[in-house]
């Protein structure tokens, strides 16, 4: 591969180094770095603000399946276990759900991990974010929740669990999109399991399901109509039944996962208002990637979902997943696909591009983007890696095409996870040489990148960053950080605790400044971390991704912190912090 774009950032697009689609990863050239001290103060220098969005209200719901085994403060879980609700303040329904076949008491929502955030294109002060909404971190027991702002992220007065699918053990993978009329579509994955005596998850079928009255797994929709002001204002049925795009007949084969959504809001598109729902179906070890679509209506309803159809994949390699659709202003739908074979332990990733120019009826591709991306194993802590890549699309032409961007995390030969970005300015035919995004000078990790393109064309890549050490004993942030509860004793340790960071680029991927810190406080990822597979297992969870979007001259992220900002999070649960930063001009 040729040189990093950072070395030619000041040149025009014609001079940008390009490689044919399908190049493999080579060692990236050295990049400009900044000191840890400079990164630490960049939060204040850039005028970033933080709001602890999910601690302002008390949310509760009755789970379909309860799990009362708890860890303790000595395990790093202060306030652990499932706790009965005493007083919800959200206005949400907490019991008596139509899809449930049991009558359990309402439980307190504690952790909120993995997230998505969308700015309303009709009103940039209106933002809806969604997140996993845990009643038991130890049991990995959660629905999805939402939190909504009408003042550009300063306050989040409406929040609660997303209703309609309480009859499943878990609802997962938060993602949403606004339609042209301001209705918000949440695409949801409800699924069932019961607990083994060890705390592991058991996926039964038929009468042994957690709730035999419902399909064991589904891809489903909840719509929040424009102008809604209460936590319960969601449309969750279509033609008198739950609004399922797809259902599975069994809970351990032919199972759907990794769903994503995009809506055509381009007035000159022939398919204005079309909603695209994409997901992976795992058929034992191989997988299939599918798309279904419907047309949104102004009142928050929609037409029937089309029969899910297969998307193109690499011949002979049925291991595609991670669909991330976007719609260009001309109505073309693009998505990346990520091929990571189970035979290689899901450690080798080839990223490709597929697209449709006729409203999702027919599809072209795949075109290879980058190959042999190495799935990282993060050092020092127990949380697992997420989706390795993210995909973005610009709404302003570059070189006569709408620009495409892919960012990904890669485990480099050093054993550390780093973040890279590549772009295409010819509809995916060629891609720029991958450029490292994180600018830390020391041997620390960056992970879970998420790319977004602002309305002015500026490219934003947000990611988790581990360069700053954990708060040290006796330091200003030590008590509020909760690191004293961490049995791994990370006081003052580097490449352990986490901040959220962001890097801006011009439309041609010229860097606009250096990495900016988006977290006011460094936080410990081990505290109250959900146990992904079993309470007895080592693997914990932050999420596979987190939310970033732009509008009204600002860029927003919603990401985790366990820090107790102002006494609102004394048990150090995973909470969602919304950061706001001014979006720079798109040209350097």
Predicted regions and their residues:
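Secretory targeting and sorting signals
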Residues: 2-27
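C-terminal PAP-associated
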Residues: 28-588
């Amino acid at each position: 591969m040729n040189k990093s774009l950072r070395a030619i950032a000041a040149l025009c697009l014609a001079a940008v180094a390009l490689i044919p689609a399908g190049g493999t990863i080579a060692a990236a050239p050295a990049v400009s770095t900044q000191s840890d001290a400079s990164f630490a103060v960049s939060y204040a220098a850039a005028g970033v603000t933080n709001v602890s969005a999910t601690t302002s209200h008390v949310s509760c719901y009755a789970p379909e399946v309860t799990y009362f085994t708890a860890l303790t403060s000595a395990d790093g879980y202060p306030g652990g276990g499932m706790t009965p609700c005493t007083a919800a303040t959200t206005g949400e329904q907490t019991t008596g759900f139509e899809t449930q076949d049991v009558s359990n008491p309402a439980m307190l929502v504690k952790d909120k991990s993995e997230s998505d955030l969308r700015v309303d294109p009709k009103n940039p002060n209106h933002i809806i974010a969604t997140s996993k909404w845990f009643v038991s971190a130890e049991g990995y027991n959660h629905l999805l929740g939402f939190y909504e702002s009408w003042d550009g992220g300063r306050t989040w007065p409406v929040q609660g669990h997303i209703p309609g699918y309480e009859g499943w053990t878990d609802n997962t993978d938060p993602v949403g999109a606004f339609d042209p009329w301001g209705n918000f579509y949440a695409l949801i994955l409800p699924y069932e399991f019961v607990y083994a005596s060890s705390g592991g998850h058991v996926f039964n079928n038929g009468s042994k399901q957690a709730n035999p009255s419902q399909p064991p797994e589904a891809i489903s929709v909840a719509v929040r109509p424009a102008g809604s002001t209460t936590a319960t204002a969601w449309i969750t049925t279509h033609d008198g039944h739950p609004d399922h795009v797809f259902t599975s007949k069994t809970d351990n084969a032919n199972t759907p996962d990794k769903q994503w959504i995009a809506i055509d809001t381009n007035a000159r598109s022939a398919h204005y208002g079309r909603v695209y729902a994409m997901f992976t179906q795992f058929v034992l070890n191989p997988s299939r990637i599918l798309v279904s679509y419907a047309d949104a209506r102004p009142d928050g309803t929609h037409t029937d979902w089309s029969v899910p159809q297969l998307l193109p994949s690499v011949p002979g390699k049925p291991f595609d997943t991670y669909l991330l659709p976007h719609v260009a202003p001309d109505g073309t739908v693009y998505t990346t696909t990520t091929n990571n074979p189970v035979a290689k332990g899901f450690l080798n990733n080839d990223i490709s591009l597929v697209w449709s120019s006729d409203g999702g009826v027919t599809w072209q591709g795949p075109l290879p983007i980058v190959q042999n991306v190495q799935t990282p194993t993060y050092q020092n802590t127990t949380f697992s890696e997420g989706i390795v890549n993210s995909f973005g699309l610009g709404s302003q032409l570059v070189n006569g095409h709408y620009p495409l961007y892919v960012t990904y995390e890669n485990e480099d030969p050093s054993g550390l996870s780093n973040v890279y970005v590549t772009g295409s300015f010819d509809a995916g035919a060629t891609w720029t040489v991958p450029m490292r995004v994180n600018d830390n000078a020391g041997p620390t990790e960056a992970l879970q990148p998420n790319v977004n393109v602002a309305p002015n064309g500026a490219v934003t890549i947000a990611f988790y960053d581990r360069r700053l050490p954990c708060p040290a004993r006796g330091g200003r942030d030590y008590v509020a950080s909760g690191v004293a509860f961490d049995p791994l004793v990370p006081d003052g340790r580097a490449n352990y605790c986490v901040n959220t960071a962001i890097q801006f680029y011009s439309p041609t991927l010229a860097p606009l400044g250096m990495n900016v810190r988006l977290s006011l406080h460094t936080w410990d990822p081990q505290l109250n971390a959900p146990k992904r597979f079993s309470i007895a297992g080592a693997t914990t969870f932050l999420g596979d991704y987190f939310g970033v979007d732009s509008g009204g001259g600002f860029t927003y992220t919603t990401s985790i912190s366990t820090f107790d900002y102002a006494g609102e999070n004394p048990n150090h649960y995973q909470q969602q912090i919304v950061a706001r930063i001014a979006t720079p001009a798109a040209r350097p």
